[in-house]
Amino acid sequence: MIVCAALVVPPHSNVYVPQELAGRMVGLDYGNGTAYAGLQMLEGAVRRDEVTTCAAVIHPGERYAAMLRGAFEATVLQEPWITVAEKAGCRLVSTTFFHGTWVAGPDLDPALYAAFLRGVTQAVRRINADKRRYVSYF
């Protein structure tokens, strides 16, 4: 299992489980996979009418900083920001994994999609072979 996203609260938060986020503001990057992952984690723990979210920036580092500034009480992060947050004393109140799917429209050329998957696979191989070379991108 690959942890894709984590619902994170700052070190000073009194939230320890996702149920405690009922009615509290969670910053999500609407329209992106991490936002859907966040909704999945929240809706599994909180009544739908108690899920409270706001639009947050797409870049996870900026979202993390906004959470620490108090713009919202929790947000969803992915690696390497999950590790950064944990090292700073933040808590993961929920995690979810990557289901192994990509979203594409019905008009997407299958050959183009196959090329995309080959590119992702090659990128993963290169990063895993020399992580220090690519760490600055995170």
Positions of predicted regions on the chain:
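Short, glycine-/small- and polar/acidic-enriched structural segments
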Residues: 1-57, 63, 73-77, 90-96
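Pocket-lining segment of extracytoplasmic ligand-binding domains
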Residues: 53-138
